[in-house]
Amino acid sequence: ACPISNYRYLEKGYESYFVPLEANKYLFKKIDLQKKYDVSFFGAKKSTREEYIKYLNENKINVNLMGFYNVPDYNWDNLSKFISQSKIVLNFSNTGNKNKFYSHSTIKHNFFTFKGRPIMVGLCGTLCISEFSPANQILFNNYLPTFKNKEELLSECKKILNDENYYNKLKNSFVEKCNEYEDHIYFKKI
């Protein structure tokens, strides 16, 4: 489920649709709770994630974690609640250096892939800040704040957290954009 693949099929003349797997508004739903976490992340501890989170913590941006150091309690309600209580949820696109089975072992591959996390977060009524990936640029354009290194991430977090009006404007436009990818919207097209 990658928007880049969708475009490649369309270029070849095939009928194609981008169908995100993580876009069900009945699973990922906004729960009206107080935003008690400034910045959060849910997911596994891999690639550069720990380095970025540590850098934020060292610079007085506390990152609340779910499933990072232990097996996550992932059921849809707990995850929606966790996201809904956060002002910002981080998304990391970097898969890390990996050797693929078809490549020579001396060639390292570092992928910046599409993750469904931004859509999940937006459906819960929360803002996401994402590591850059080409797919996110296609889907969200300027509606999704992005970063390419830990310094940019810190700067973006500070800018958003220190300006409530800017935060609300950004969050509302991001959430509206995410709703365009919700299952019940694109099912009608198919």
Identify the residue ranges that each predicted region occupies.
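Nucleotide-sugar donor-binding catalytic core of glycosyltransferases
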Residues: 1-142
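Short, hydrophobic/aromatic alpha-helical segments in well-folded domains
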Residues: 78, 117, 156, 173-174
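Catalytic phosphate/metal-binding cores of nucleic-acid and nucleotide-processing enzymes, i.e., regions
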Residues: 109, 153, 171
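Conserved aromatic
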Residues: 115, 147-148
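Short, flexible helix/strand-to-coil boundary loops that buttress conserved ligand/catalytic motifs
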Residues: 140, 157, 171
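C-terminal "capping" alpha-helix adjacent to the active site of nucleotide-linked donor transferases
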Residues: 148-166
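A charged, aromatic-enriched C-terminal amphipathic alpha-helix characteristic of glycosyltransferases
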Residues: 161-190
